[in-house]
Regions:
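Conserved "landmark" site that anchors the functional core of diverse proteins
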Residues: 1-288
Length: 288
């Protein structure tokens, strides 16, 4: 049983359902997918006392417009796109309101959770959309989004007026240095190259997406530009022939043939996901 909640007036630059991703399918070539910014998605659900794995609506950058079909409690987190409702707190949206995200100020990915959770089609155990693999698709204008009609008859105690503490609301314009675990081909890179990687700022390019974030900076020169293809995990820092790193993201291939200098710590990958094209990031090694 579901309840119609939003009419998509405009999906903006992209709108999909995402959750914590699908597990156990990598050996079949299916990436985990899931929310690009797990930190923001988690807080959207947590504010409403939803299960942390409940589907959320992931919006890209700006431009989305949603007509509210009935009164609903919701939470908006993630990128700042000048939403016309308060963010990082629970909000009671009224029927006939239009939720808008007109202009991006910082960050890339926006998250909306609704009390009880969205109803999303589960494919291979997850509601996360993986468009390249045709597991679900992005929403288009005119579609209706529904929530699960659960057993709750009143809002859980303490949810109304709840907000995220200031220390957990991230300033996406100023990311910290991202921590890196050593990669399996770290020895392909000279000490000079490692010092160059960790000592230089790297610029996120406009070719970055859910598959991978491409960085540009001083060219690295691994001793071998290709290896026999092997499993690749989300967050791997691959260095192709041009010497410009690519960080694999939630929809990345599950195998690859480029040497891997390291892997971004999972807790820091959400920071990278929210870096806009042109933004600079730095990395620091995790000492083992």
């Amino acid at each position: 049983m579901s309840v119609a909640l939003f009419n998509v007036l405009h999906p903006g630059l992209g709108a999909t359902f995402q959750d914590q991703g699908r597990r156990g399918w990598r050996r079949f070539g299916v990436p985990p997918s899931g929310a690009m910014d797990e930190h923001a998605a988690m807080w959207a659900n947590r504010l409403l006392d939803n299960p942390l794995g409940a589907p959320v609506l992931e919006l890209l950058f700006q431009g989305a417009k949603l007509a509210v079909l009935r009164d609903a409690w919701l939470a908006i987190t993630g990128a700042d796109a000048q939403a016309n409702l308060p963010t990082w707190r629970t909000v009671h949206a009224k029927a006939d309101e239009v939720i808008q995200f007109p202009k991006n100020r910082s960050g890339v990915w926006i998250y909306i959770a609704v009390e009880g959770g969205f109803e999303g089609e589960r494919l291979l155990g997850s509601a996360s959309v993986y468009q390249r693999g045709r597991l679900g698709r992005g929403f288009v204008s005119g579609e209706v989004l529904s929530k699960i009609s659960g057993a709750r008859y009143e809002l859980p105690r303490g949810v109304a007026g709840r907000s995220v503490i200031a220390s957990e609301r991230r300033d996406y314009a100023s990311p910290p240095s991202l921590r890196i675990w050593p990669g399996p081909q770290l020895n392909f890179f000279t000490e000079a190259d490692r010092a160059l990687f960790f000592g230089s700022p790297w610029t996120v390019t406009s070719q970055s997406d859910r598959v991978g974030y491409r960085l540009v900076g001083p060219a690295l020169k691994p001793s071998s530009a290709q290896i026999i293809s092997e499993p690749v995990r989300v967050g791997s820092v691959q260095v192709p022939e041009n010497g410009q790193p690519i960080v694999t993201m939630r929809d990345s291939p599950t195998i690859g043939g480029y040497p891997k200098l390291g892997m971004v710590a999972p807790a820091d990958l959400s920071w990278l996901a929210q870096c806009r094209p042109g933004q600079k990031v730095r990395f620091q090694p995790i000492e083992t």
